[in-house]
């Protein structure tokens, strides 16, 4: 499959460990692709939940996926500052249909003031027991929480102001030329 190009729109599909579709985001504009990473942006995009419920995102969000890390990052650009929602998840794959990954329940939320919260630990434990997450998967996910927290604490990659400025400005340029 040819990698999507800058300005192309892709869908994003989140699955659970058992292979069931969890959530779909309809339109994300690709801002950059490389061998390992995808950076994109969506704004007021349609989201469909596994139970069929639909809703629309409220603000622009930059997305970051990397094939070597077991997390992805959503930077929500709001009036009061940037909030981050980080999913502990498998590295992504891309096919003709969508960018796809397995959501492993654990999430890290970062507020504009820098406060961090680890979310959905109970959901992770329940699904781990239900779907028999391997010890290796558990080890990888816990190691990636540490990498993610290091990135957050040190303003690396998507957690830097420069990253947000560069990629959100690029999104605005591309969106206004359509």
Swiss-Prot record:
Catalytic center residues: 23
Residue stretches spanning the membrane: none
Catalytic activity, reaction form: a ribonucleoside 5'-triphosphate + H2O = a ribonucleoside 5'-diphosphate + phosphate + H(+); a ribonucleoside 5'-diphosphate + H2O = a ribonucleoside 5'-phosphate + phosphate + H(+)
Source taxon at top rank: Bacteria
Required co-factors: Mg(2+)
Keyword Hydrolase listed: yes
Record InterPro entries: DUF402, FomD-like_sf, Ntdp-like, SA1684
Group of enzyme by EC: hydrolase
EC number: 3.6.1.15, 3.6.1.6
Keywords noted in UniProt: Hydrolase, Magnesium, Metal-binding
Pfam families from the UniProt entry: DUF402
Family affiliation: Belongs to the Ntdp family.
Protein's name in the database: Nucleoside triphosphate/diphosphate phosphatase
The species this protein was found in: Latilactobacillus sakei subsp. sakei (strain 23K) (Lactobacillus sakei subsp. sakei)
């Amino acid at each position: 499959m040819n990698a999507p190009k800058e300005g192309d729109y892709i869908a994003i599909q989140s699955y659970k460990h058992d292979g069931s579709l969890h959530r779909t985001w309809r339109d994300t504009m690709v801002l950059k692709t490389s061998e390992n990473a995808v950076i994109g942006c969506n704004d007021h995009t349609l989201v469909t939940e596994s139970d069929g419920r639909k809703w629309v995102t409220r603000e622009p969000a930059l997305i970051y996926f990397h094939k070597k890390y077991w997390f992805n990052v959503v930077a929500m650009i709001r009036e009061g500052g940037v909030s981050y929602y980080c999913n502990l998840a498998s590295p992504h794959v891309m096919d003709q249909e969508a960018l796809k990954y397995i959501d492993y329940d654990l999430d890290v939320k970062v507020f504009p003031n820098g406060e961090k919260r680890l979310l959905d630990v109970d959901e992770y434990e329940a699904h781990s027991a239900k779907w028999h997450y391997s010890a290796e998967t558990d080890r990888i996910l816990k190691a990636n929480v540490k990498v993610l927290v290091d990135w957050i604490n040190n303003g690396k990659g998507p957690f830097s102001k420069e990253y947000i400025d560069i990629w959100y400005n690029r999104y605005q340029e591309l969106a206004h030329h359509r």
